[in-house]
A protein has these predicted regions:
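Extended, hydrophobic alpha-helical segments in both membrane/secreted and soluble proteins
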Residues: 383, 449-463, 472-489, 631-632, ...
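Feature representing long, continuous alpha-helical segments
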Residues: 454-458, 478, 598, 614, ...
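Aromatic-residue-lined binding/catalytic grooves and analogous aromatic/hydrophobic interfacial grooves
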Residues: 22-444, 451, 460-464, 481-484, ...
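Aromatic- and carboxylate-enriched substrate-binding clefts and catalytic-loop regions
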Residues: 464, 488, 493, 503-518, ...
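Short beta-alpha connecting loops at secondary-structure transitions
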Residues: 508-525, 669-680, 714-717
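Bacterial Sec-dependent N-terminal signal peptides
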Residues: 1-23
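C-terminal catalytic domain of Rieske-type non-heme iron oxygenases
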Residues: 363-364, 368, 500-502, 510, ...
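Acidic, turn-prone loop/beta-hairpin segments
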Residues: 675, 682, 696, 701-724
């Protein structure tokens, strides 16, 4: 057989699907169409999202636009709070927590609305003629290019469908091709779950058009209007209108479809835009050369995605469909699946959170319902923050910007919530939405939490630690100061220890077990609150010093910080969740809020607070592993910070537990790799990506720690592009047999690079001399000091057991690279 014929056979096999794309490890691929939404593949460009089902006969593209939310501009504070607050506090301090909780609901929770729902636009349907049976089916999502492909053979003809949500063009673009001319025939139409205020029509330009209005909700009028347009460019064949809402293509050689969605949203206070005009503006990019539009899309996407790569090795598992690999992950070694899942989290963040747009919500931007689970809001007691945990470390700082903008806007609206308590500054409670509402919602069981402003501010400060950008810090410092002013007014002295505490509050979504019974959530001075307020004060003092703020303000913060409740170790060696030693070792609640100081905070460390480190480990062990999907993602981060890579890896196997459940506490991963609470919540995807990063590199505790929590199963690998605090970029790190071999670090802003590693190091071939653990002189690489913890008299204590490490200081210059190795370079 000639070489020419061999090449032709190979090409035919690739086209027919007999050889799948195993050469590219960054693909989710399947051998059957999606039947459920959680099997469809997500595309997004930050503004619009699409779920691709891949059905040969009846293709569907479920559509979202980031600003299609119910309701309209408003806030939802309760003016009765001022009068009720002193009484609620008195009841708490008298031990009458149930009575305080009963009063909190009507007195402080919103009496108007509990937040607005994120809503779908609808679905574009393509119904194809003559495709009743098919063979050689294959569909994939290439997360290296952000393109979804479906391929199959029917009636001896090979069909290929490509789809992508163009980043530069802001459109969904779909390309249909066939191996035989005149083989593409279909009808196209929209559907939507809205039952009112919708219109299906054919535009004067022969486009499908869907006009709609988002719903009223809880008495708040829905004022978001949207228009979806689909333009069909057929090469060969005919395009005609077959009804007032359907277009038909007959006998085309190829077809390109362009989907544009516009709304009247201007900002959280203004919905005076023109939805049709916006959709038309985006549609101006349609009709241009497809290959060039595709190349431009890939280039725009890869400027972010290609910054980081992870190679953990591969094996024959890559030859199996992704859903099967998920089913087998806990029992079969599949290092490349872990790398794929890590990168899938980065893919989702790029696709759901673009500069200038909205922050990723509970479902990112993907939702097929009129009322997404938990309304798809920005739940602030962990979920929206978790969405952005991988932003800075995995080199997606630009993707962080929509969340930082949300913080800026909430800080404005939140003045009303602070005033509700007769306080200066700003705050919000456990949820917000596109309208930046800041009131307490969902009743006393969930709404009693005014502390998330401190968590929001942690993101502001942490971003500065990665960049050292003082212009940025000057921009966000007033927000941090405003949050501090709220606590200077809101903190109250509890009578037992005379500590300053947050009251009323709760440990998110958990309730203490008092005398074996659970009867209330509302308390004073939870550990999480104490950790976050301390973190806010400490960070703001550092920022104020950099901003040359007057010392009277920073002195007041330090004075109050000295009177905050310290962390406590309880009777069974646990880190207490509440001020009282109420923790139940049988409590397996999904939230582990008292471990905030371990992750994402930086107050608990093996090297600087070993007693608390062991107490946190005791608490986390008792909480258990399997839980909701997002909880397991958090636990990956926590076990990485506990320097236990094998346990962190166990949590990854738990999170990659297959499920198709839509409700319950049995979390895992859906066939399309979406995280399952269940139902779908995107935060677990981001949490696990952040946790995997922490297994390779940590920089929160005063040094850039290389391979702090490497599991035995990943004995060799290469990671590139991870960002560290201090303005350092880990350009590449290689390891073999569980030991680092080389690491190249670029200093983007100069200053001292402190390295912690498990092996002696050489710099450019010269042996380095270790230094003492005393803090280095780089202000961006400092451990966070804490108050001395209180330890119960009967608490069992142990000393952390961890591998010996070496600490090195390297003076760096801006833009220079430093190559570290564990042996002289000439060996």
């Amino acid at each position: 057989m000639t070489r020419k014929w061999l090449i032709l056979i190979f090409i035919f096999c690739c086209i027919s699907g007999k050889i799948t794309a195993h050469d590219n490890s960054l693909k989710l691929w399947y051998d059957k169409p999606a039947k459920q939404w959680v099997e469809a593949l997500p595309l997004g460009n930050g503004r619009i999202g699409a779920m691709v089902f891949g059905d040969p006969a009846h293709e569907r593209f479920q559509l979202n636009e980031e600003t299609v939310w119910g309701g309209s501009p408003h806030n939802n504070t309760n003016p009765n709070a001022k009068e009720a607050l002193p009484r609620i506090r008195r009841l708490i301090f008298e031990g009458k927590n149930k009575e305080a909780q009963e009063l909190f609901g009507p007195a402080i929770c919103s009496q108007s609305a509990n937040g607005m729902p994120y809503q779908t636009v609808g679905t574009l349907h393509l119904d194809f003629e003559g495709i009743n049976q098919y063979d050689d089916f294959y569909r994939d999502l290439d997360i290296e290019k952000a393109i979804a492909t479906t391929r199959f053979t029917a009636n001896g003809i090979t069909y290929i469908r490509e789809a992508f949500t163009s980043f530069p063009d802001r459109l969904l673009i779909i390309k249909l091709t066939a191996s035989k001319k005149k083989s593409i025939s279909f009808t196209a139409h929209y559907t939507t779950p809205y039952t009112e205020n919708t219109e299906f029509c054919i535009s004067p330009r022969k486009e499908l058009q869907l006009n709609g209005k988002a719903n009223d909700h809880e008495g708040i009028e829905g004022k978001i209007r949207f228009t979806a347009l689909t333009r069909i460019d057929n090469n060969g064949g005919t395009l005609k209108v077959t009804s007032d809402s359907t277009l038909q293509v007959k006998n085309a050689d190829s077809v390109t479809l362009y989907v544009s969605i516009g709304t009247n949203f201007i900002n959280y206070k203004d919905v005076s835009g023109d939805a049709l005009k916006a959709a038309r503006q985006y549609m101006k990019q349609a009709g241009k050369n497809y290959t060039k539009r595709k190349e431009a899309h890939i280039a725009a996407y890869q400027q972010y995605f290609n910054r980081v790569s992870l190679d953990l090795g591969s094996n024959d598992q890559i030859k199996k469909p992704t859903d099967r690999r998920v089913r087998e992950f806990s029992s079969v070694t599949d290092p490349q699946m872990a790398a794929l899942y890590f990168q899938f989290g980065r893919y989702l963040l790029i696709c759901s959170s673009q500069p200038g747009g909205q922050a990723a919500n509970l479902q990112g931007i993907w939702n097929y319902q009129l009322r997404a689970p938990w309304d798809g809001k920005y739940t602030t007691d962990i979920n929206v923050e978790m969405n952005y945990w991988p932003a800075e470390t995995t080199a997606l700082s630009e993707m962080h910007e929509p969340f930082l903008q949300l913080v800026k806007e909430v800080a404005i609206q939140g003045r009303e919530s602070a005033s509700m308590y007769s306080c200066r500054g700003w705050t919000l409670h456990h949820n917000t939405d596109i309208w930046r509402t800041t009131g307490a919602v969902d009743g006393a069981k969930y709404g009693v939490w005014p502390t998330c402003n401190a968590w929001f501010c942690q993101h502001l400060w942490d971003r500065y630690l990665f960049s050292g950008d003082k212009n940025y810090l000057a921009e966000v410092y007033p927000i941090m100061r405003g949050a501090c002013e709220f606590y200077l007014d809101f903190l109250v002295r509890e009578p037992k220890n005379n500590w300053l505490v947050v009251a009323p509050s709760y440990s998110p979504e958990n309730s203490p077990s008092v005398n074996g019974k659970r009867g209330f959530v509302i308390v004073a001075g939870t550990t999480m609150d104490n950790q976050m307020v301390y973190d806010l004060f400490y960070n703001t003092i550092q920022a104020a010093n950099l901003m040359n703020e007057n010392t009277a303000f920073t002195d007041s913060l330090q004075t109050v910080a000295n009177h905050l409740a310290p962390m406590q170790v309880g009777r069974w060696g646990q880190l207490q969740e509440w001020m009282e030693d109420w923790d139940n070792p049988q409590d397996h609640h999904r939230h582990v809020s008292h471990l905030w100081g371990l992750y994402p905070g930086r107050q608990i460390s093996a090297y600087h607070s070993p007693v608390l480190f062991e107490a946190a480990k005791t608490s986390l062990t008792a909480r258990g592993d399997h839980s909701t999907g997002w909880s397991m993602g958090w636990k990956v981060c926590l076990w990485a910070r506990l320097l236990d890579g094998n346990h962190a890896y166990k949590l990854i196997t738990e999170q990659l537990h297959p499920t198709t459940d839509e409700r319950g506490q049995n979390g895992g991963t859906y066939p399309n790799l979406f995280d399952a609470h269940p139902p779908f919540q995107i935060d677990g995807n981001f949490g696990c990506t952040a946790g995997i990063t922490e297994m390779f590199v940590q920089s929160h505790d005063g040094a850039v720690h290389l391979l702090p929590a490497l599991p035995d199963v990943w004995e060799r690998g290469v990671i590139k592009g991870i960002r560290c605090r201090g303005g350092f970029l880990l350009e590449e790190m290689k390891w073999e047999k569980g030991q680092m071999q080389t690491a190249t670090i670029c200093s983007t802003i100069g200053g001292t690079l402190r390295i912690r590693t498990g092996s002696p190091l050489y710099l450019n071939g010269e042996k380095l001399e270790p230094v003492e653990q005393a803090p280095c002189n780089n202000p961006l690489l400092q451990p966070q000091p804490i108050r001395k913890p209180l330890i119960a008299a009967n608490a069992p204590l142990s000393i952390p057991q961890y591998k010996e490490t070496y600490i090195y200081d390297i003076t760096t210059d801006v833009g220079k690279k430093y190559t570290l190795s564990t042996r002289p370079m000439n060996h």
